[in-house]
């Protein structure tokens, strides 16, 4: 086992504080409408430029191991805030820095660290309740645009694009961000259910000019099995041919004579048919086939349910207004499934999302939810260079997370004003002893830090502006972009309540642990013995000098 380096008390805390400040100072320059960029060196390719707090935090590793421990703990604050709300990482880092700095001063002055932490926790619990009282719902397109604009660093086009996307696919719809090919941002909306499986044979194509298969008012056969024997399919093919409607077959696989028969029938015009593989794998495939059958009003032909393909009838098939199949995707538009059945399926998926523990499972469940409830919107980010593209894409993703958080828990006045108002309303709070009271004051003072930093980044005097804002009431605050005072809601400067709440809670949680730290342990650096071993043979040969 490697030897350890152990530091105690003030010596440990000073080292840790140095690490906290290095990371927080690098992150906080990005805050506000006049925040600066940070350039991050990469091991290969061009450096990346960002105004995203968590991207800056993730890049920082310090040489001194004790300082690095402090930096890594604050990095955890930014990561947690990012995971919870997708934004507010810079605010969370700044709050943590302020609480740690003020808290460690109090510890050095002889206060009890545990009581300080209890005071900080008490102040935060009270502040979160006050935040909920200040929060107003964010439901209209204008408010969503404003939240998106603020989070995208005052880029109004991004805010408007996100609001348009949410309007088209609904608040539950999936909105993805991709790198575009042009200079302008674009919005592409896919209505209906789309999955990543294309036609099994190019001979199904009936629109050669675009290379796609288009079926109008088709029957849809959903089978959770491989189909290779054509005899299984003959009864259903005959029934569909008599109806005069086209047929889409979605199955685990379709091969051999079964596929050949379908191709021949399609080319001769006996029955207009197309076949695709079922999306997903394993249990996820079964769930998605069930989704498709519910959306189209059909049944999944599955041997597990004792259903045989040979005995299936037109009543077992689903229907849709239109199906479009390309080389890579299948889109089902206007499924005729019953609304209450679709709605109960949506409720079931929502319940699964709440119970899911892994991010991957949640992401896949959200995709299924969107496909059933509205559609998918793709935001394509345009830029002149790759460096700008990466920076812009990160901002758009932040803005998207912020707008989702705003719809979920509402909004409060932005620009650090909400936290100042909350601190004012919590100022009469008292703990069980003086040390707890100091902890409460530490937390309340920290709540002014975001406003002070926004003002500092815009080149004004933080204390003057903070006092002016404190003298005001309600949503009265300072607009750093235009250098004027007024109602932040009227200015369109809003923060999602969830983002502000998460930032405060995670900052206080980690900062409280750091204040109560008394000992730090790390590995001692290993001594490089190679230089000693290289020098020993030469030293042993010294006596040979007399032979010359």
Swiss-Prot record:
It is an enzyme of class 5 (isomerase). One of its GO terms (biological process) is protein refolding. Keywords: ATP-binding, Chaperone, Cytoplasm, Isomerase, Nucleotide-binding. Its main location: cytoplasm. It holds the Pfam family Cpn60_TCP1. One of its GO terms (cellular component) is cytoplasm. Its EC number is 5.6.1.7. Forms a cylinder of 14 subunits composed of two heptameric rings stacked back-to-back. Interacts with the co-chaperonin GroES. Together with its co-chaperonin GroES, plays an essential role in assisting protein folding. The GroEL-GroES system forms a nano-cage that allows encapsulation of the non-native substrate proteins and provides a physical environment optimized to promote and accelerate protein folding. This is Chaperonin GroEL.
């Amino acid at each position: 086992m490697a030897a350890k380096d152990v530091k105690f008390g003030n010596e440990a805390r000073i080292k840790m504080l140095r690490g906290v400040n290095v990371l927080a100072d690098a992150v906080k320059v990005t805050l506000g409408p006049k925040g600066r960029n940070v350039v991050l060196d990469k091991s290969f390719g061009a450096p990346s430029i960002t105004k995203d707090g968590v991207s800056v935090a993730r890049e920082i590793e310090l040489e001194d191991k004790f300082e690095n421990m402090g930096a890594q703990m604050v990095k955890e604050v930014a990561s947690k805030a990012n995971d919870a709300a997708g934004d507010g990482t810079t605010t969370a880092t700044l709050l943590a820095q302020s609480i740690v700095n003020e808290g460690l001063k109090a510890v050095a002055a002889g206060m009890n660290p545990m009581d300080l932490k209890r005071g900080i926790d008490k102040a935060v619990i009270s502040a979160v309740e006050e935040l909920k009282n200040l929060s107003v719902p964010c439901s209209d397109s204008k408010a969503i645009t404003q939240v998106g604009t603020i989070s995208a660093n005052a880029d109004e086009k991004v805010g408007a694009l996100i609001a348009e996307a949410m309007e088209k696919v609904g608040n539950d719809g999936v909105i993805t961000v991709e790198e575009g090919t042009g200079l302008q941002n674009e919005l592409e909306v896919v209505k209906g259910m789309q999955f990543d499986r294309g036609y099994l044979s190019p001979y199904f194509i009936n629109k050669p000019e675009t290379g796609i298969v288009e079926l109008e008012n088709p029957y849809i056969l959903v089978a959770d099995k491989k189909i290779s024997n054509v005899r299984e399919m003959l009864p259903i093919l005959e029934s569909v041919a008599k109806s005069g409607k086209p047929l889409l077959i979605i199955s685990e696989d379709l091969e051999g004579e079964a596929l050949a028969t379908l191709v021949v029938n399609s080319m001769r015009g006996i029955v207009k048919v197309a076949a695709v593989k079922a999306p997903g794998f394993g249990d996820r495939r079964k769930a998605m086939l069930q989704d498709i059958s519910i959306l189209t009003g059909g049944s999944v032909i599955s041997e597990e349910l004792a259903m045989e393909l040979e005995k299936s009838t037109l009543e077992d098939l689903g229907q849709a207004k239109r199906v479009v199949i390309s080389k890579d995707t299948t889109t089902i538009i206007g499924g005729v499934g019953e609304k209450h059945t679709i709605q109960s399926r949506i409720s079931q998926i929502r319940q699964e999302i709440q119970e899911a523990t892994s991010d991957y499972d949640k992401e896949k469940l959200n995709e299924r939810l969107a496909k059933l409830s509205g559609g998918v919107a793709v935001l394509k980010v345009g830029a002149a260079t790759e460096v700008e593209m990466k920076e812009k894409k990160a901002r758009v993703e932040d803005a998207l997370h912020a707008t989702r958080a705003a719809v979920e828990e509402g909004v409060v006045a932005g620009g650090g004003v909400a936290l100042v108002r909350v601190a004012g309303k919590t100022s009469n709070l008292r703990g069980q002893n003086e040390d707890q009271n100091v902890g409460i004051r530490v937390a309340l003072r920290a709540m002014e830090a975001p406003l002070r930093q926004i003002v500092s980044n815009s080149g004004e005097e933080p204390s003057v502006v903070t006092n002016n804002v404190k003298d005001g009431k309600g949503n009265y605050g300072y607009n750093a972009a235009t250098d004027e005072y007024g109602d932040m809601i009227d200015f369109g400067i809003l923060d999602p309540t969830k983002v502000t709440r998460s930032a405060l809670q995670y900052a206080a949680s980690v900062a409280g642990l750091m204040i109560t730290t008394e000992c730090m342990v790390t590995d001692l650096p290993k001594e490089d013995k190679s230089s000693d071993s290289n020098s020993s043979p030469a030293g042993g040969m010294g006596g040979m000098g007399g032979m010359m």
